Amino acid sequence: MAAPAASPVDTPDTKVANLTIGKALNEALRASMEADPKVIVMGEDVGKLGGVFRVTDGLQKDFGEHRVLDTPLAESGIVGTAVGLAVRGFRPVCEIQFEGFIFPAFDQISSQLAKLRYRSQGRLKRPW
């Protein structure tokens, strides 16, 4: 015989936020951007529109166009630009609107980012 375990929500000192996934992502991006000026958000319609699912709503207004960048409709270009920014010390966050569009962009990670150190004879380091 066992008593049911107490849920973490049942403890008096625990605060649980009731957020949508989009709102939670927005708050996490905002906190990251406040903590680190090298965090940049980029993607299609992430600026004034706030992203297709409004995940980036208000970020461009608060952090400026130089940190929340609207990009052309070119997922491979978005990720390739992010790779270059990361190598230079920035912390880019890419929004790819739909998972079906990530496959062409994955080449930037597997064929470019993964080989930068060797192609540059060690001058460029991967950002991790």
Where are these regions (language model features)?
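Thiamine diphosphate
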Residues: 1-128
